[in-house]
A protein has these predicted regions:
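Residues located in well-ordered beta-strands
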Residues: 6, 20, 37, 70-72, ...
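Glycine-rich beta-strand-centered segment in the early N-terminal region that forms part
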Residues: 25-43, 54-94, 100
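Cytochrome P450 core scaffold surrounding the K-helix E-X-X-R motif
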Residues: 46-48
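A structural motif shared across PLP-dependent enzymes of the aminotransferase-like
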Residues: 95-110
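Glycine/charged-rich beta-loop-alpha catalytic/anionic-binding loops adjacent to active sites
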Residues: 112-122, 150-156
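Mid-domain Rossmann-like dinucleotide-binding core that forms the NAD(H)/NADP(H) cofactor-binding site
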Residues: 126-207
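Conserved small/polar residues in nucleotide/adenosyl-binding loops
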Residues: 209-211
């Protein structure tokens, strides 16, 4: 790996909050037993809050945000991974407590990582990212068991709120693919055609409902 690399660093000094892309070296990365060359990360709602002002989610500064990433193992002291393994990370408070994915290299606990499926490119994995993982987990809760979901047994009618957001959009796609009759709930009339194009059979516009 290079002697130095780029990372987005946030810092708080008194009332001053700043964000800056800086050159750092490996010694800056504090935690973990696996060093990853980061290919992609994504911008999640929690990331936006942290980038705005730390949102009380970050306790120590300076800090590298980014709650998910995909990439390739560069160095490993963890028996589960070896250099060259393609991995995905989402969650585990990475980007909050631990340094995150807005860096060309990340060092994390190997227990936080999973190997990337060969059916996805590194870029595709982060297009889905934390939002896709969350949507799939939410879809599990509509079934009796995870196995039923994977077998494709459908729930007849499902309402997805916040349907035009990252999690909601992917949930609409997943449930439509499984054969459910999806009703999407949104706050904007302009989202109607988009939601129908990704699989919603019905769209409820909350802005037109007066109670």
């Amino acid at each position: 790996m290079p002697e130095s690399f780029k990372a987005l660093i946030i810092n708080q000094e008194g009332e001053n909050f700043n964000r800056e892309i800086k050159s750092i070296d490996k010694s800056f990365l504090k935690h973990g037993d696996v060093l990853v060359k980061v290919d992609y990360s994504s911008l999640n709602f929690k990331d936006a809050l942290i980038l705005k002002n730390g949102a009380r989610l970050v306790k120590e500064f300076p800090h590298i945000p980014g709650i998910d990433f995909s990439g390739t193992v560069e160095e490993s002291e963890n028996d589960k991974f070896k250099p060259g393994d393609e991995i995905i990370l989402t969650g585990w408070r990475v980007g909050e407590i631990f340094y995150g994915g807005y860096s060309q290299y990340a060092k994390v606990n190997g227990d936080f990582l999973v190997k990337k499926p060969k059916s996805l490119t590194s870029k595709q994995a982060m297009i889905l990212g934390t939002a896709g993982f969350t949507a799939l987990q939410c879809s599990f809760t509509t079934k009796t068991t995870r196995e039923e979901l994977l077998l494709g047994e459908k729930v007849e009618n499902v309402i997805v709120t916040g349907a035009s957001g990252g999690v909601g959009s992917i949930a609409v796609m997943i449930l439509n693919k499984l054969g459910s009759n999806v009703t999407a709930v949104t706050g904007k009339e302009s989202n109607k055609e988009y939601l129908k194009s990704i699989g919603a059979k019905n769209v409820i516009n909350l802005s037109l409902i007066h109670i």
